Amino acid sequence: HLWETWLPKKFKEKGPRVERRRLGEMLWVGGSKMYEYELDTPDAPWCDIWFYEDLVYPNKRHVAAVGFAREEMTMSPITYDEMRPGCYEPKARVEDMISNHVEASLSFPTMPRFCGQTFAEAEDRELALACVKAYNDFMVEEWCGDSNGALLPLIIIPLWDADLAAA
């Protein structure tokens, strides 16, 4: 939803997208790539996977672990259908916070990574900057906008350009 709504039309085709695919074995390789994946493995579990340039970023259960027992908090693939809506819908997030007596929350990005490294490592800088702006607009206007201060915006900056970052 974020990229379809907030990314300018000229970038939507090349921007981040989610595909539901079967995800086989994940192999730790380290570095900025982190993992190698076996995609479309027959009989492997379904997973909602982010794709952006050459990045393949599967959603993993440990990132959206709420509602799962401790022993189920694994690196296993997960779809949005299996996640609690508070993991990706701001109103549901605030409802979860209220039921857990949490006054405020700062949400860190997943696919963009904690400070936007995904876009800093991108080849297409124009697209990357558009993604940073779209993410920030979404974070301030949509994710946090109607939360009455319960959701605190955490924006990302274009790490590859000090002048753009300072602007």
Annotate the PLM regions:
Residues 1-167:
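Helix-coil boundary/capping segments in enzymes
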